[in-house]
């Protein structure tokens, strides 16, 4: 992008919301959330930086998935997700991971694993630049306010 805001291009063009993009460690893919399948029920997608190849990674229309983030190794995605099948008041955001494999030729997601199981919100996960720490925001503190939490990441080194 130029300093004046020119020289930009759109890479998605579908009905609904597309947002929350993050680059892969090799800068060739972007992960993002979208409600194009069902309004407000965010699913995760990957698209190459040219906008030519797109892959849907989650497909549960009762689940809200947001804040996807790459592990620096490029082997995992992490995100916040909540089951909305019984309505928003009973939905609890927890953290989920997916092993991934990608190259210039394509992007493939694997099995989804839930890694936190709290009745309060675990959201906005990020990895340290060396991939050894996981940090997120949670309301699991005694006073239920949003606070920062950290843990060693023991997979995907």
Model-based region annotation:
Residues 1-157:
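Sequence signature of WD/YWTD-type beta-propeller architectures
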């Amino acid at each position: 992008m130029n300093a004046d805001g020119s020289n930009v291009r759109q890479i998605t063009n579908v009905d609904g919301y597309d947002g929350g993009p993050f680059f892969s460690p090799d800068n060739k893919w972007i992960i993002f959330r979208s409600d194009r399948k069902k309004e407000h029920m965010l699913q995760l997608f990957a698209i190459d930086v040219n906008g030519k190849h797109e892959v849907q990674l989650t497909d549960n229309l009762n689940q809200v998935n947001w804040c996807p983030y790459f592990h620096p190794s490029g082997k995992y995605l992490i995100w916040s997700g909540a089951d909305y099948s019984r309505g928003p008041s009973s939905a609890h955001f927890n953290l989920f991971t997916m092993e991934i494999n990608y190259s210039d030729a394509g992007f493939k997601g694997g099995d989804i694993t839930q890694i936190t199981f709290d009745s309060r919100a675990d959201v906005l996960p990020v990895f340290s630049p060396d991939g050894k720490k996981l940090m997120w925001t949670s309301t699991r503190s005694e006073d239920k306010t949003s606070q920062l939490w950290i843990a060693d990441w023991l997979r995907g080194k």
